[in-house]
Every structure is written in structure tokens, then in C-alpha cells.
């Protein structure tokens, strides 16, 4: 445990300080949970550009955390999903009706496996983003809604989806989550946000229209295609 904590602290140092070019700790003496660095070499230089682009794995985007007030006056924390959210996500899904799950996944799903939930919570923040609305209480945390975008290999377009707990509709969560996702994907440099839903999912169709999506109802296919350009008018001109 001691070594793990030491490595985490070194990793945090590298993540936070883009100016570090080289860090050499040698020798390092360990005695139980105590460590003594006898010699440290640190090379630094000015860094210009995306500070996170130099990292093999993009770290947790703490800057995306935001407290949002719902229509009922309660506050929810909007934040990127974490690997440890798996049990919270399982509990959230159990409070979504089969009808709403069918609208989201286009099939009847009886149960999500551990692998399914792991894939939903253990994500590469550079290629995928899932933002959850979390309510905190004395009993702990609970997920109220989630929105997700998965980009293509070129990081140009992204497929999106949004799901809110069935007993919490009407609080503006879906809209606020999707607005948050639109802002993130636009800032991330993506060009277009795409999604599909069903014609009888009127709530999603109405929300998409309000947020400026192009809505293409394809009754023959039984789907509604949703598409939003993320490129500002100034850039297009």
C-alpha cells in the first residue's frame, strides 16, 4: 500500500507539472510504508500546448465537475463517470423502467453483467465521455442520470445518448445533462454529435429540437436520427 501511494503521488506530480521533462529518483530506500529518496534529478523546461496531450492516458477531468440546481430545488453534482461508479450505475439502472431502457438500447435487457457495467464506467476520457448527475446524502451517493458521447477513431464525430431515472423526469435533468455534453464535445474539438431514438420517444425528440438538433423521422426504419453541428457559424464561414 505504501509503495502504491508513493507511485500515485509521483504520477500526480507528473500530471500536474507539464514542465517536467525528466524525473530520476535513485536510489530510493523503503522501510515499511516510509520512503527516503537519497538522490533526485529533475529536469524542467517551458511547455506549450495541450498539457494533457503528452500523457498516454488522459486523467480524470476534474474541471468538468459542476453543481446544478434541479427544478425541485435540489442540487446534483454533474461529473465525469469513475470506475468505482459501477455499483451506483447498477442501482441507477434498476430504477429505470423497461420502456425507458428499450428506448435507450433498442432491445429488451434483463440484466447488465459486470463486464457491461465495467465498459460503461472504465472509459478513456480522450475518446469517450460519460457525465453522471449525482445526488449526495447521508446514505451516500446515487446516480440520477447519465449522458454519454463516444467519438469516432478520428475524433471528429461522436454518438450520444442520455438516460434519466424514470421517477425523476420533469426536473430538467435530461436537458441539463445534454447541454453539458454538447459544451464538452464542442470544447473537445468535435464537429458533430449524432444519435438515434424511436419515434414514440417524444420526450427525446422534443428535447433534441429545442437544443437545435436536426431531426429526421424515418418511419419505415422505425428510428429518428438526431444530428447537431458543433462548429460555430464563424468557423464555418
Where are the regions that the model predicts?
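N-terminal loops that bind phosphate or other acidic moieties
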Residues: 1-46, 230-232
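Long, contiguous binding/interaction regions
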Residues: 45-237
Amino acid at each position: 500500500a505504501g509503495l502504491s501511494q508513493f507511485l500515485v503521488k509521483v504520477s500526480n506530480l507528473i500530471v500536474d507539472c507539464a514542465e517536467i521533462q525528466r524525473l530520476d529518483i535513485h536510489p530510493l530506500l523503503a522501510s515499511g510504508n516510509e520512503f527516503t529518496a537519497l538522490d533526485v534529478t529533475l529536469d524542467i523546461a517551458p511547455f506549450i500546448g495541450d498539457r494533457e496531450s503528452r500523457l498516454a492516458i488522459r486523467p480524470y477531468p476534474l474541471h468538468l465537475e459542476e453543481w446544478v440546481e434541479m427544478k425541485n430545488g435540489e442540487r446534483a453534482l454533474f461529473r465525469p463517470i469513475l470506475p468505482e461508479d459501477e455499483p451506483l450505475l447498477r442501482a441507477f439502472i434498476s430504477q429505470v423502467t423497461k420502456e425507458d431502457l428499450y428506448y435507450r438500447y433498442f432491445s429488451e435487457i434483463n440484466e447488465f453483467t459486470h463486464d457491461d457495467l465495467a465498459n460503461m464506467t472504465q472509459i478513456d476520457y480522450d475518446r469517450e465521455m460519460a457525465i453522471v448527475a449525482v445526488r449526495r446524502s447521508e446514505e451516500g451517493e446515487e446516480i440520477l442520470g447519465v449522458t454519454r458521447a463516444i467519438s469516432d477513431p478520428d475524433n471528429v464525430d461522436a454518438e450520444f445518448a442520455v438516460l434519466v431515472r424514470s421517477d425523476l423526469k420533469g426536473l430538467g435533468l435530461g436537458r441539463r445533462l445534454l447541454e453539458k455534453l454538447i459544451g464538452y464535445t464542442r470544447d473537445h474539438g468535435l464537429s458533430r454529435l449524432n444519435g438515434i431514438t424511436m419515434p414514440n420517444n417524444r420526450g427525446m425528440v422534443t428535447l433534441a429540437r429545442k437544443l437545435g438538433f436536426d431531426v429526421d423521422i424515418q418511419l419505415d426504419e422505425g428510428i429518428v436520427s438526431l444530428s447537431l453541428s458543433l462548429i460555430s457559424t464563424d468557423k464555418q464561414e
